[in-house]
Amino acid sequence: MILDLSYLRYPLPSDITMLFESGRFEEMERLIELNLSKPELPAALKKHLEFLRYCAEDIREAYQLTSEQAFDNARKRIPDLTRDEFHHLRDDRTLDWRYIDGKRYYRNNCINNLLRTRRPYALREKGTSILLEEENEAAERDHLIHTLKEKGRIRYQGTMQESISVCSDRLTPGETLRFWLPLPVRDFPLVSSRLCQTSHPPVQISPENAPQRTAYFEVPYEKNVTVAATLTWETEMVYRKPDPALATGELPAGDVTEQDLAQVEPHIVFAPYLKALTREIVGDTDNPIVKARRIYDFITTQGTYRFMPSYRSIPDIVGYFCANLHGDCGVQALTFITMCRCCGVPARWQSGLYTSPASFGMHDWAMFYAAPYGWLHADCSFGGSAYRNGAKERHDFYFGNLDPWRLPFASRFQYEFTPPTRFMRADPYDNQVGEAESLTRRLFEDELDKSHNLLSGTLCD
């Protein structure tokens, strides 16, 4: 079922809101405690106040660089960067920052973000490592796109290992820990998958069609206890070039559900600005492919990529993108989905791992429905990268298609696990690296070491 986080849309007391926005988290915590002690406090408000604590933790963890530290880090990578340039990058929202306790703190990876999204600065980087890395990845994608277009379909077979290790002096040896490791979900482009080996016997394995599929374990704690799994999978990508002239607008009941057009609070919401912006982008067309393409073009040409803090710390993910015109792969995918649904085009979430030889890691993308083609993919962040680098063919490709280097772990956003967690997840919206908790509390990030490693990957006809 959908994880109910609708209470995050409810208003907070004005003093607590001001303290949160200004980063005065100790004062905020004191007022939260005061409010929670009131027996007349509405239950919905209580949940929102408790969630705000997680937001504060995430922000403190993500924004730790003072202005001088951020500038020094930038100068190490770009030796000729001036302070005026640094301030301009701050003011045009390239460098992400927040006020915490009255001081400006920058996002820990803001310089990496600058070098990955602003090519003129990447060209000035000492060693140009990021630029070379991106050029290699782009060449790899372009070669595969040409091959897929030529052959019409490509299969990919992969093997990976994932694990969660726990080490903490706040846990008692022998107490039960609960683990959820992500498993591939049966959704296009996945053809098959197999759980080959686990470090411990799983208590429960979700069905293949579970929206966020997991292997669930219960293991007694000991120092550095590790729960691990080895997976194999096969995907098949078929090249499709959606033609608006062939679109019918039909929504077959077997292919499309109410969920594919629904709002899901707190983020997939047809807020007034979202509706106005979508109308402006889409215009008066009734063609679902044209609608989706106009939304894709808006996000990929007007928006830019930015590394994001934990989604728990963002009150309105889609509203954030619409106001700031930047965000990471998940923010862009969720914005695409919400805009599509807002104008009557069915759309849904997909996420998991990108598993190419040059790059292996977490990634999010979207799907939209257009008869007679059925469900099609849209990868706004990869499309935006292609647009920024003048790669029109690759930009067009990621509207309607994916490369086969995808391992989907989730087919829905904000879905509960089976069995559900007892405490707030580190990521209540998605599941790409797994979750862990004890029977009495959630586990903190400094108690956990999560990893995933690609063991092998082969493209095949």
Where do the model's predicted regions map?
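Acidic low-complexity segments
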Residues: P13, F20-G23, E27, P207-P211, ...
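Short intrinsically disordered coil segments
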Residues: L195-T198, D243-A253, C380-G383
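Low-complexity, Gly/Ser/Thr/Pro-rich intrinsically disordered linker/tail segments
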Residues: G400-D461
